[in-house]
A protein has these predicted regions:
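Conserved catalytic/acceptor-binding region of the Class I
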Residues: 149-154, 161-171, 175-182, 372-429
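Short helix-loop-beta connector
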Residues: 39-45, 272-278
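A short acidic, Gly/Pro-enriched loop at the edge of an enzyme's catalytic core
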Residues: 100-110, 335-345
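Class I SAM-dependent methyltransferase SAM/SAH-binding core
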Residues: 47, 52-99, 280-282, 286-335
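A short glycine-rich, Lys/Arg-flanked "PGG" loop and its adjoining helix->strand segment in the class I
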Residues: 125-137, 359-374
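Class I (Rossmann-like) S-adenosyl-L-methionine-dependent methyltransferase catalytic domain
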Residues: 1-43, 49-101, 119-126, 140-230, ...
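A short SAM/SAH-binding and catalytic strip from SAM-dependent methyltransferases
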Residues: 108-122, 345-357
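Conserved Class I S-adenosyl-L-methionine
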Residues: 185-226, 421-492
């Protein structure tokens, strides 16, 4: 590693730092984008790892109370010190990050740009645990890495970079663990957002530059069936990569929600999409609906999902047609922040069933929509209680929070929406389930060959049980349409 950076640090230029001949142009647009993703650093103590020649150091120092800038290449650090000599709140430290020592709770934010991809999995996990100790509770870690493959065009006689998949970073980050003194409470990282750097998409048609923002939070496994975070529950239990592809085989290419492309076309037609509009898809899955909307209506779509496995597949598919205005991010809709009036449409298919406080989420949707903006949701709902014991067990096992169709619609009205339509589409749901079950049985041999006999049985049994729950009146399927009033304010 030292040898690699000795070769690429002789001039301490931005081209060497970014390993790209167009670095100056990229940096001009990328820098404000990266900084805009940070949490507030006003009066914060910031640790910058891999500070390099100081592309970000000075900007951090303008707002933070103090910045500790660390890099293991003295030539880069000397250039950083020269460029940022007017800032009196920066400490420059030449060190290997794997050997760093700081007191517990020393920093509010840890910032890193292109560093972790030079560490082994073992070194990175060790650093994750260290950063958890160094950060105060509620503190944030921001980092950005090259994923999948090389992005810069600089020639390299050898390349020690580890081009991980985004899901691998998620798994390593969430494996980190800090036991607090007295064994009272443990801490770990929880994802706030992970997304591709838009500058690279626009200028280089490259979705492989990915950044993350995580928060140090207390850990309680009880709430996620033994998993440390809800995201781990989704990726490890319900939406493993194999499980996602298994669902796609039933729903149709690109889809993991009821009815696949057919219901997507039906429901999207209700939105009267116009070219240039901005659409937010909450729980985008593997992106089929996003690609359809972008291609058919020339809209700009942002797909968000908490499952890193889902988004990783969507990002892989996005590289097949770089002309489509589609972006994907791993994020939690209950924590994500967008500027008010950012979108013309918010769209969500069979996803909000995982979220407990639906009313609070709908208020967020309201703020994010422009006046006159439209909301379209399909979601699992429930019949009136008491439920059967089988349905109680099913809901608990899946971690669902379900309401009746009418209650769901009432939440939307209370959040400020108008022209609310809350339709019980259970009959359509049953019809779709029967067709999907029939189609699955017709390709039994093909399905088993591609997946396994257990996977086939899982689908057939699962769909049959959905039909039973609908027959019993426990499980419902709702379609919801609503609009933000044209003259309403955001003060809901």
């Amino acid at each position: 590693m030292t040898e690699f950076w000795k070769i690429h640090s002789k001039g301490a230029t931005v081209e060497e730092m970014m390993l790209d001949s167009s670095a100056s142009t990229l940096s001009q647009f990328e820098k404000p984008e990266i900084l805009s993703l940070l949490p507030s650093i006003d009066d914060a103590k910031v640790l910058e790892l891999g500070a390099g020649i100081g592309r970000f150091t000075g900007h951090l120092a303008k707002q933070a109370s103090h910045v500790t800038a660390v890099d293991f290449m003295q030539t880069f650090l000397d250039k950083n010190r020269e460029l940022n000599r007017d800032h009196g709140n920066i400490k420059f430290l030449q060190a290997d990050v794997t050997q760093l020592q700081f007191p517990e709770n020393s920093f509010d934010v840890v910032f890193s740009n292109w560093l972790f991809m030079y560490l082994t999995d073992e070194e990175l996990l060790q650093l994750v645990n260290s950063m958890l100790r160094w950060l105060r509770p509620g503190g944030h870690l921001f980092f950005r890495e090259s994923c999948f493959h090389q992005s810069g065009d600089s020639k390299r006689t050898f390349n020690p970079t580890i081009y991980r998949k985004p899901a691998q970073y998620n798994h390593i980050m969430q494996a980190g663990f800090q036991q607090a003194n007295g064994n009272e409470k443990s801490f770990g990282f929880e994802l706030v957002i992970s997304k591709s750097v838009q500058t690279y998409i626009k200028l280089k048609k490259n979705q492989n530059q990915v950044c993350w923002l995580l928060e140090k939070v207390s850990r309680e496994n009880a709430g996620h069936q033994g998993y440390a975070t809800f995201q781990q529950f989704l990726d490890g239990k319900q939406y493993s990569r194999q499980g996602i592809l298994r669902y796609e085989k039933i729903f149709g290419e690109g889809y993991v929600s009821t009815g696949g492309p057919d219901t997507t076309k039906e429901f999207v037609s209700l939105l009267d999409l116009q070219a240039g509009q901005k659409v937010l898809d909450v729980g985008c899955g593997i992106g089929g609906g996003n690609f359809y909307m972008a291609k058919a209506f020339k809209v700009d779509v942002l797909g968000m999902d908490l499952s890193s496995n889902m988004v990783e597949i969507a990002m892989e598919r996005a590289t097949e047609d770089s002309t489509l205005l589609v972006q994907f991010e791993i994020s939690d809709a209950t924590k994500r922040e967008f500027p008010e009036e950012s979108f013309d449409v918010v769209y969500s298919r069979d996803t909000i069933l995982h979220i407990a406080d639906k009313f609070a989420l709908f208020k967020r949707f309201y703020r994010w929509l422009k006046p006159g903006g439209k909301l379209l949701i399909t979601d699992y709902c429930c019949g009136e209680k008491p439920w059967t014991s089988k349905f109680e067990d099913y809901v608990k096992q899946r971690g669902y929070i379900l309401y009746s169709v009418s209650k769901y619609g009432k939440f939307l009205e209370e959040a400020g929406f108008q022209n609310v339509r809350a339709e019980d589409r259970t009959d359509q749901f049953v019809d779709i389930l029967n067709k999907e079950l029939e189609r699955t049985k017709s390709i039994q041999d093909e399905f088993i060959k591609e997946f396994s006999e257990d996977d086939y049985s899982y689908i057939v049994d699962g769909w049959s049980k959905k039909l039973e729950r609908c027959e019993a009146g426990d499980q419902k399927w709702g379609l919801f349409y609503a609009e933000r009033p044209i003259n309403a304010s955001n003060g809901v």
